[in-house]
Amino acid sequence: YVAISRYNLALYALSKVTDENYPLKGVRTGEVKFLRGATYFFMKTLWRYIPWVDEENGRTVEDVTNISNRPNGTDDTYLWEHIVADLEEAVRLLPEKQEEIGRINKNAARAMAAKALLFMAYKQDARHQVVEVDKKILERALVYINEITDQEGGNVGLCEDFAENFLPEYDNATKEAIWEIQYSINDGTSSGGNTNNGAELNAPSWEPYFPCCDFHKMSFNMANAFRTGT
């Protein structure tokens, strides 16, 4: 919600300027809508019922405190509708290409909107079992998917070698990547770079080189599955 607060502040600030005073208003609004929609998407898939706070209903601490994660006992459909609305607005506002590497473009928004719609289409009960598939929502997702795949051979396509997606020499250069988060290393900052902290936490504990955190531990079931007999 720290991230959500920042998006909401940005959207509120953007609403106070005109296109004449700030020609990039529409593009920047689309970028922030994408980020907010994507962040809420990941929150939604983790916790299902979450409070929806935006630039209109969450202006004060009191406002936020009064927001329920299930207004009037509703199901979670309204959350998907908000998430998809943000992402579809991003599709409308963003350009096909951005001048600066790492900025979100229309294809990134199309892909994220399609992903959210695919999740939304599969209705689940209280035990997270799929009980219904909404074909109309799947058709909405297919529109965005087709808009991307129709560019095959041009802006998008599969790499001859799948490994190219992960090798540094192909950074921001493969047609298979829809959008890439930008990381850096040894960039002159005090932290040593804008790195993926989550990935760093997976390294085995190895003082003094890796003091933390060895997260990639197998489960007991996995260990037992490969336990040798005596």
List PLM regions with ranges.
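An aromatic- and glycine-enriched ligand-binding surface/loop that stacks and positions planar moieties
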Residues: 1, 50, 80, 88-89, ...
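Conserved, well-structured interaction surfaces
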Residues: 1-47, 68-81, 86-101
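Residue-level detector of alpha-helical recognition elements and their boundaries
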Residues: 22, 52, 58, 98, ...
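Short, well-structured active-site flanking segments
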Residues: 44-56
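Flexible, glycine-rich phosphate/dinucleotide-binding loops
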Residues: 46, 61, 123
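Short linear capping/connector segments at secondary-structure termini
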Residues: 55-67
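Short, flexible loop/turn elements at secondary-structure junctions
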Residues: 56-59, 98, 162, 183-185
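Second-shell loop/turn segments in exported
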Residues: 65-74, 128-133
